[in-house]
Amino acid sequence: MLDNPSENKEVILLPDGRIDLIYSQSAKEPFQAVLLGIGTHPEQIVIAEKTKIFAVSFNLLATEYILHQSVSKLLNSAQVLPTDFWDFNVDDLNDFEKFCEKISIKIQQELTQKIDERKLKLFDLMYSSKGNLTVKELSEKVVWSERQINRYFNQQFGISLKSYCGILRFRASFQHIKEGKLFPEQNFTDQSHFIKEIKKLSGFLPKELNQNKNDRFIQFSVLPEK
């Protein structure tokens, strides 16, 4: 949930490997539902004053088994959904706990199809390893050819498996960077490789992300302190 009661706020969204379902309303914009695809580069946005946003973040398998659609055309893009998508309306933004209850029930209702075991294992390995397994290793563990996996990824998500694993490694570094650990803790070959990959996906150096001036990196701002 994000509630911006004051003036317009500029923020930067960083790639995190998730698909986001956004319900929002502001003083100038009516209630709307938007589906955000995978991001591969930072995006600067302005959150208008008096804006309330409720967001639901999904892992990739949800696109096929809960949202029932390909998001390949939504790479670095968004789709405006019908305003009554999943039977939500502006009144649902008044109570976050009730919103969470309602969305949880809806997700369970949409999950009607048995999940392919190979896909389930593939994503379990990807997320548990935080993107640190190679495409070859994943292919061998799942017993699914690299070519078929990449075809599935490109058709369903608009991105290769290798590129997506890079985003997962990047996302896994958020907490370390926020804590001031500006050195590689994921599967980066060395410090220069770490800095290069972080800058490629964020547009900034690790130390700039750590400083997070004016809370502009919204995902860093909501990370818990340790």
Segments the model singles out, each with a brief description of its role:
Residues 114, 153-177, 197-201, 205-216:
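Alpha-helical DNA-contacting segments of helix-turn-helix folds
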Residues 1-120, 127-130, 134-136, 142-146, ...:
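Alpha-helical bundle regulatory/interaction domains
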Residues 149:
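Nucleotide/phosphate-binding loop and acidic/charged catalytic motifs
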Residues 123-127, 171-174:
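Hydrophobic residues on short alpha-helical segments
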